[in-house]
């Protein structure tokens, strides 16, 4: 008996292997459909029915002496029964083989495609199935003694099934089997799934085709032995199925799909499991082909099977044997290629052929031969019920089965996964809005809308809380947007709110607010939650060519420009918070986006997109704000947007309309912005958006702006905190990007200044700006300067470039990026600068107070007079400076670094004093404008723009910087306090003004270069100054000098005293603080500065003065 039992284990193994197949993959799904309890009971019931049906066949065979299924059917029901059994057997075997191929294609295609580097697809799947059929299935199927050859493979296949079961168990443990969470998520009884699962369960136990061959292969055939063999086999299979179904269902609960293997993540274990399962299925093919081929042979050649006594392994002519084998193997392969769903083929086959072969036919045969068999009645009726009900159910579900399995299981999984991802994303956005912003900026110009909305909500939440103050800040922010158009006019009121809060201050522009009614003023995005500094960064106008290039990035770029239109069009308002953190931690946030592009690409595309939108909207909406708006229009014209920008610049009402949705308005403005966003990418669409904005109630917009301004103040503090977190998070990213950008910009600088390395963000822009300048035909700057009312308006290209360059450093932590240092250094420098600037702010205030005292400072010199007078005076007072500006720019680089640091701080103070808080809020734009002006002045005063090659020039700059930069610093310091990025921007400005920080000098120099080129003589000086003035070293000096800025500012303030009284310190291209100041003193200061600069630079300063005039128009209007 022991030997017999041992020999029986080989048969048991074969039977188990023939039973276990692709159906095991559907067990968890069936448990989900029926519930754990009902599913287990159905499995046990189907196992019992299968055992009974097998015993029916064994007993019938022992009584009738027939050894084939078809022979028993012929013996019981004649030819009809034989035909029914043969066709059912053929259909069952073919369906099973098709299911095998489908599983092989599903499990093998992914693995082998990745293994060999192919793309998973229908072609590769077809190739895989063909290879498996030709190399594995066919050789095994062509063997005549299949039982002996397959046993070894059966044992190997069972090993994979065992491993599969343990993997399922471990998966359930991993998914919290003992935590008990699944108890609430699983179902225990679902009667509606019974008729969907019984066919699959019946198919999963289908082994009737192996009963008689196994019985015939026994040395001593007996019913008892067969009963024990099949009982053992079915018990093993039932246990296996219950374990797989239970643990698989617990692991994936309602997300369970038909093929549970597809749930597992891709790793070595699961991949080996899939391959092993695929191989076991391939090896199991011969077990299915054997009865199928025999049934086909008896069906086609029944004359040889007349008596039905031939055993299943009976002799078959070689030709027929091979033909039938090939037809079955490749026929089922075609079916496997055409039918991609395992559940569909198993359900249909099990409900029809499976029920006939497994239950109905054995019960009918046994009932015919054994007259009294109650069990046969039960099995028969169950089989008939399965045949009828389950077939109808399966057919009705057949179309849905793939969808249900895919949707309910994979879809459920995907839905849950997506839900979890959304929840996590929401958490991340709430916890780390900056991180979300960085991701948004990178991933999408399109997605920014949703992300912006999320972050806007975060920022707007506080913005909405202060509804009163936001009204002021929002219009001011809109004004900042206008400077961003290309007008370098600093926003005075942007700083007035709270210098430490860069966003609010940047947003606020009293001068622009005064110029344009708050209603007309585009509600600043800063009020909407954007950092004013970010707006300034976004504001820098770019040439049309650059804008077009960057328009695809406008989704991201438009966000930063801080234009209501850009935000509306791009739906970027939600990004305002992101931008706010960028302003505070601009190097972190913007570098992520900017770093996307080479150097300033990110910046340029955004400023350009913003410029196109902002110049259209700001020129349209900011025409009043910077009645230098027409000059920006002209500048825009230079950039390629002259018509729209200039036209809009002349239209003050439009800005009010467009900006209205921009100032971080409630969701309604956002919707309007979204509407405008559709056409916002184009100037015409922007105009339409402006019209839409007009439709918004100005009262509502003003109220919202006020609220947003108040909220922005609060948000500024919050944003600074967020910026710190964001900066930390993005330090590495920004550092890497900054390094890349530095490398690229440095290359640009190498072209620009062979001896000076230019900041990353500015290097590329300067190269572009210079190219644009070179390409641009020389244009008389005087008319342009006086375009906005007799005052010279800097060309937008210059402003844009200066803004871009300044924006690049701002986004990149201007001081830090040139060195490629991590943002943390710029941030630390910014913090230091902020502290220094805080000290310098009062100093700047004092200097500003002193400045108005000067007769020249108080009166605002006429554009023409200033154009000639300051330059002439500068030339007279510093006859060598104009030359030094051109020739001594490189010399200035050395002191310029120090001067850049000190000048930056001084300029920032001067800007603060001159521009007031608006300078800070408008710093990004103001800075670019000032930088462009200063750079233009520096270009005009070739030595002054780049750096104090000659210290007297530096001194000249320093007094002016002290006056202007003191005013700017007053605002800038507050703004720096508010925005580290803005501080750096102003630092860059200071660098541009004094040493012309290589970042700023580049942008300013590009602008200056363009203007000088337009001006025959100044161009040379500017070009000289530009190549010589640019130095990456300024970045570190700026950072280091930030500490020195206080002392330098003090010293320069002393120097400024005489300059302010007598002559404004000649602007060696350093004057950055010519921001439109709400105070008359600022205008006087600007006039005096312009006069001095013009005196020093002579004709060259006229171009710069035009820039100054553009910036200045705001203050005169304010005055």
UniProtKB/Swiss-Prot annotation:
One example GO MF annotation: L-amino acid transmembrane transporter activity
Basic and acidic residues bias locations: 439-454, 466-475, 493-522, 544-559, 592-603, 668-677, 731-752, 763-773, 832-841, 863-876, 975-1005, 1012-1022, 1033-1042
Catalytic activity reported: L-glutamate(out) = L-glutamate(in); L-glutamine(out) = L-glutamine(in); L-alanine(in) = L-alanine(out); L-serine(in) = L-serine(out)
Record-linked Pfam families: Aa_trans
Positions of transmembrane segments: 4-24, 36-58, 84-104, 120-140, 153-173, 229-249, 272-292, 323-343, 345-365, 378-398
Top-rank taxon, per record: Eukaryota
UniProt KW Repeat keyword: no
Record field: compositional bias (Polar residues): 880-889
Organism encoding this protein: Homo sapiens (Human)
Intracellular or extracellular location(s): Membrane
Keywords of this entry: Amino-acid transport, Membrane, Phosphoprotein, Transmembrane, Transmembrane helix, Transport
Modification type Phosphoserine: residues: 612, 802, 889, 965, 997
Pro residues composition-biased segments: 652-667
Function: Facilitates bidirectional transport of amino acids. May act as a glutamate sensor that regulates glutamate-glutamine cycle and mTOR signaling in the brain. The transport mechanism remains to be elucidated.
Main location group: membrane
Phosphothreonine, modified sites: 772
GO cellular component: Golgi apparatus; membrane
Recorded topology in the membrane: Multi-pass membrane protein
Similarity remark: Belongs to the amino acid/polyamine transporter 2 family.
Gene Ontology BP, a term: bone development
Region Disordered: start-end pairs: 438-691, 731-1071
Alphabetical list of InterPro entries matching this protein: AA_transpt_TM (IPR013057)
Record protein name field: Solute carrier family 38 member 10
